């Protein structure tokens, strides 16, 4: 199995690494977002979350996962966020604009500023054998399955209120 390793790629080391993913099932009108936060060696999962919700889009799920990850790294730290959503990264870095997702872009910027985070966004090809990207993809699928079969929104009761409390504060 191939997976990304900063020691082999010559990438700078960060305080934390995060992987995020989002998905959406159009016919069923619900989607899921997931993230994991890893230690500075990108080997141990420090935090993981996944949640299913209705009435969204795949793109919004991807952006929500990135924001959620940022809410779960310590303030004033550096974090490399790896996502398989090129358009989401382009949106958050200001390469493209979107009226539809502007609220989440604003929220991303506010979280980054308020928490004094040094964030680097990096694209990873989906389904390419990267173990952590594959894992967050699995968490999304699991969240969708739990939501469809049992109506369970949050994986194993992991607290997801941080994102929604932050949004309500605005």
Q: Where are the regions a protein language model picked out?
A:
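RNase H-like nuclease fold core
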Residues: 2-60, 64, 70-73, 166-169
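RNase H catalytic domain
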Residues: 20-30, 66-139, 144-152, 156, ...
